[in-house]
């Protein structure tokens, strides 16, 4: 059973009527983060410009009170990420939370990976959201179908890759770090799965950090635990 914590304000910052970034920690949902901030800073309204999965970290762009009306535009901004992908394995959730569903011993070579990523720059990409996601089909969230072992047709979604670059690749562990600059609605988990398949292999997302949303950058964001202190 997960330990429940209380929080206290760490600062006397005024976060009312503001747009600001929070460095979301791992194992917190995006909604958990903003609801904690809302409660302990006495805010009337709060929202964010794009969900990060609980396992992801990085820039959660937040708007409060009167500024929440700007979220509809902020959500449309391009986003930049650093993703760590593990090849040779496929999982049910396309990330480290799921069960391993496929495995191969085939090795990916750095040159092949570089060529594939270069090919994907400035291209439209058709992807299916992960079955374990909050996307709604016929009024029901995809993860609800998955948990009930119910099959459902998941439509492909047209998204855009502005730029994708190889940061590093380890040929022994078959792990890679890539940077991605993508349009709204882009699922990095689906990308990890798809890039594995495109390379005649498998892949899943090990770690993800969002570093930019439009003109807002992670290095300008508040650390979550600088805003609130966790107490038993």
UniProtKB/Swiss-Prot annotation:
Active site residues per record: 53
GO process annotations (BP): mRNA pseudouridine synthesis; tRNA pseudouridine synthesis
UniProt-listed Enzyme Commission number(s): 5.4.99.25
Protein's UniProt keywords contain Plastid: no
Pfam families: TruB_N (PF01509)
Source organism, top-level taxon: Bacteria
Catalytic reaction list: uridine(55) in tRNA = pseudouridine(55) in tRNA
Keywords per UniProt: Isomerase, tRNA processing
InterPro entries in alphabetical order: PsdUridine_synth_cat_dom_sf, PsdUridine_synth_N, tRNA_psdUridine_synth_TruB
Recorded GO MF terms: RNA binding; tRNA pseudouridine(55) synthase activity
HAMAP family, A to Z: TruB_bact
NCBIfam families linked to this entry: TruB
Main function: Responsible for synthesis of pseudouridine from uracil-55 in the psi GC loop of transfer RNAs.
Family, as annotated: Belongs to the pseudouridine synthase TruB family. Type 1 subfamily.
Listed name of the protein: tRNA pseudouridine synthase B
Organism of this sequence: Malacoplasma penetrans (strain HF-2)
